[in-house]
């Protein structure tokens, strides 16, 4: 084992330019060929990221205001996605060695099909309102009072592959809410309707001005269809620590310690705390704010500020790393906040590998699949590998 601990941070949606197959992916009828999340954010504002610059992010692609530097303790490149799809679950599963060959369904522009909703109404005995892509807080303002009067289910989606059901805890008891959501999960297992997650979204309050979502949210995710690098690590008794939404993305499969995060800031603080602890294995963090708060909302300045905030937290994390630790920064897809539409964009993702033990650094060739990350981690811990991906461990000198 070369590295006792591997810290893997997924900067959710921070792509570095359209992939070769971006012409097959679309936002409101426009293909993704001109997308470049990181590049376009830098062009739209004064982006100052000294720590990412030192690590070599400006060596991966041209980023306005960020220099290409001589690398002494980091290796950088970009990675192409092999799976079909450009969503969070697909990207993360591929990182850990599982390809998605049938994309998860999204219903952002159309809402859910009538047949699906008819079956949900029939099996739950309740009518459905909403059926649009919406912000969870905004839809409560629009439909919460109607739901309280009628008991109808507020069903909505987002740019992700998800079906969400908002229900008031005093109108529909929480256990009944979970039963309704389990029915929705069963219905959405069919290939034509298969969504990555069904989410119960309970709320309380008396009117549209004071509705508030409660902590009784419940996710009905899809378990990965095959074992991933996470399983092989945990089966070999290594620590697999999932921070943020990682546990939900993998439905807990192969994970033996986890905690949620409330923000990117919280995520960076949590991973820094783990760096101060003794463990052997993988600590895996997703920074979701980039995607959820800024990418989908097409807010390049908010996105850029979030990158700068993360950049400012890197030194403390890195100061707590040991000689035999490896830090990897990457992403799971793109979400160009300057692009048309509100959906993800099909892009290459960055890869930065840093260790205090590196004697040199430099640029690696483009990696052919996100699964090279999982393969490298498996190689390091000498555990079974998935059938996808090639390790680049030997290239890290």
Curated annotation (Swiss-Prot):
One of its GO terms (biological process) is 5-phosphoribose 1-diphosphate biosynthetic process. GO terms for molecular function: magnesium ion binding; manganese ion binding; phosphopentomutase activity. Binds 2 manganese ions. GO terms for cellular component: cytosol. Its cofactor is Mn(2+). It is an enzyme of class 5 (isomerase). CDD domains: PPM. Pathway: Carbohydrate degradation; 2-deoxy-D-ribose 1-phosphate degradation; D-glyceraldehyde 3-phosphate and acetaldehyde from 2-deoxy-alpha-D-ribose 1-phosphate: step 1/2. Mn(2+) 1 binds at residues 12, 332-333. Pfam families: Metalloenzyme. Mn(2+) 2 binds at residues 291, 296, 344. Its EC number is 5.4.2.7. HAMAP family: Phosphopentomut. Isomerase that catalyzes the conversion of deoxy-ribose 1-phosphate (dRib-1-P) and ribose 1-phosphate (Rib-1-P) to deoxy-ribose 5-phosphate (dRib-5-P) and ribose 5-phosphate (Rib-5-P), respectively. PANTHER family: PHOSPHOPENTOMUTASE. This is Phosphopentomutase.
């Amino acid at each position: 084992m070369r590295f006792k601990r591997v810290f893997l941070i997924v900067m959710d949606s921070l792509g570095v330019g359209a992939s070769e197959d971006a012409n097959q992916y679309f936002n409101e009828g426009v293909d993704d060929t001109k997308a470049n999340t990181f590049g376009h954010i830098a062009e739209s504002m004064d982006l100052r990221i000294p720590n990412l610059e030192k690590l070599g992010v400006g060596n991966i692609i041209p980023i306005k205001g960020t220099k290409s530097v001589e690398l002494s303790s980091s290796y950088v490149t970009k990675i192409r996605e092999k799976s079909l799809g450009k969503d969070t679950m697909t990207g993360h599963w591929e990182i850990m060695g599982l390809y998605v060959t049938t994309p998860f369904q999204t219903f952002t522009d159309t809402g859910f099909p009538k047949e699906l909703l008819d079956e949900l109404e029939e099996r739950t005995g309740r009518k459905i309102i909403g059926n649009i892509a919406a912000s969870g807080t905004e839809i409560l303002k629009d439909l919460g009072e109607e739901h309280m009067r009628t008991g109808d289910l507020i069903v909505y989606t987002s740019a992700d592959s998800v079906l969400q059901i908002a229900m008031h805890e005093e109108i529909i008891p929480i256990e009944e809410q979970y039963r309704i959501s389990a029915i929705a999960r069963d219905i959405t297992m069919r290939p034509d309707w298969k969504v990555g997650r069904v989410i119960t979204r309970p709320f309380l309050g008396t009117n549209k001005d004071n509705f508030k979502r409660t902590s009784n949210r419940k996710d009905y995710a899809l378990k990965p269809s095959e074992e991933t690098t996470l399983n092989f690590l945990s089966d070999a008794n290594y620590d697999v620590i999932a921070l943020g939404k990682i546990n939900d993305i993998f439905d807990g499969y192969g994970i033996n310690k986890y905690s949620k995060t409330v923000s990117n800031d919280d995520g960076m603080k949590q991973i820094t705390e783990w760096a101060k602890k003794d463990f052997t294995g993988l600590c895996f963090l997703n920074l979701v704010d980039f995607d959820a708060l800024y990418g989908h909302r097409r807010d390049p300045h908010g996105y850029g500020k979030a990158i700068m905030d993360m950049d400012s937290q890197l030194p403390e994390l890195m100061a707590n790393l040991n000689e035999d630790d490896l830090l990897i920064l990457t992403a799971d897809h793109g979400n160009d906040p300057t692009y048309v539409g509100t959906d993800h964009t099909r892009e290459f993702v960055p890869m930065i590998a840093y260790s205090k033990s590196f004697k040199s650094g430099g640029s690696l060739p483009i990696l052919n699949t996100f699964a090279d990350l999982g393969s490298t981690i498996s190689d390091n811990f000498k555990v079974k590998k998935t059938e996808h991906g090639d390790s680049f461990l030997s290239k890290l000198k």
